[in-house]
Amino acid sequence: MLAFFNEAAMLNHLYRFMTLCETNGGFAYEPLKPVAFFPGTFDPFSAGHKRIVEEIVLRGFEVYLAVDEFSWSKRTLAKLLRRQIVSMSAASLPDVYLFPDEIPVNLAVPDDLKTLAGLFCDRELYIVAGSDVILNASAYRQSGPGTAATCNHILLSRVDAAHAGDPRRAEDILKGKVVSLSLPAYYESASSTQIRDYIDKDMDIGMLVDPVVQD
């Protein structure tokens, strides 16, 4: 009997709500935000990474963070551990989400980029990449429709000491819209390489990562 009255009360409130929506208008939804996609990172999620995400959110973007499986060129942590670090570091940030593992995205494969764009129909999609990556990654040496260089980008200005004399500019390679972003020198120095070195030497990494993932 109690369940009957509970259901009746619920239906009564639901009916009133639907009536109010019909008479006063429905919900007013805000326009969908543009999407910023972080391609897979092989590194521990540093304080610099988090600061970049915070700045992008402040500029009105919805951020998706992907975690790649493996890199031959870097000494990586286990994928699930890196994914957990990213999740814990970004948990306090609004409009920041982990990108699903089930949808691999390779910037060098136009079909993957097409699939990515199709996930966010009617929304502007931006890829987040550092200027050093754009100048040196093989994905940006390709030309033609649908390649990485034709996508919109949030460009992170970085000084690459190994290519300091390179006259090329990342902006000249990119064909889509470009939103430029730079970090204070302190956050640039909080690199994943430094984090790994500190861990190997049993040194405190509290200033290099979010405090919630330090242990």
Question: Where are the predicted features?
Answer:
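Nucleotidyltransferase catalytic core that binds NTPs
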Residues: 1-215
